[in-house]
Amino acid sequence: MKVTNAEYMASAYLSSQFPSEMYPEISFIGRSNVGKSSLINTLINRKNLAYTSKQPGKTRTINFFLINKSLYFVDLPGYGFAKVSKTMQKDWEQLVNAYLSQRNTLKLSILIIDGRHGPKDADIDMFDYLLDFERPVLLVATKMDKVKANKRKQRITEMRSALELDQDDELITFSSATGEGKNELWQIIEDLL
């Protein structure tokens, strides 16, 4: 898809702040600092539309970005960051649950995993949780440019095994630095719209 327009639309601390359901939505979810915002920025050919930070836990709201005035990219707060209060973690969980359970226009949830390290227990739990909603889930392994070429096949096999993926289940390898996986990811998104 050629992105001709991408704009920030809203940040929601509460489900009542979600924009109206006018367009199909693609959600992006993953642990803190796995590269969610960088992935979004790479897909839309912008450097700073989705805020990136080296400090984990910066995305504390659900952020909606309107793409080509026809599609929302939805950046969900990162999970698994221990340096926030239990109350804040619970608030994030409730907000994300409200989003995932209420949005009729949600077409795909993209679960982002750090390809350098593979899935952590929290990633496996999130994958199972997303599957409970009976909507499409796509796995994307980011930062693959940092995995040595002679270790990539082994890393992908390990990720597929840890997540108990079937042969037909897709796992996209992605790099914001090189653009690897960008076209493949866009093709999957376009096929769902």
Swiss-Prot record:
CDD domains: YihA_EngB. GTP binds at residues 30-37, 57-61, 75-78, 142-145, 174-176. InterPro entries: G_ENGB_dom, GTP-bd, GTP-bd_ribosome_bio_YsxC, P-loop_NTPase. The keyword Transferase does not apply. Its cofactor is Mg(2+). Pfam families: MMR_HSR1. Mg(2+) binds at residues 37, 59. Residues 22-193 form the EngB-type G domain. Keywords: Cell cycle, Cell division, GTP-binding, Magnesium, Metal-binding, Nucleotide-binding, Septation. The keyword Transmembrane helix does not apply. Necessary for normal cell division and for the maintenance of normal septation. This is Probable GTP-binding protein EngB.
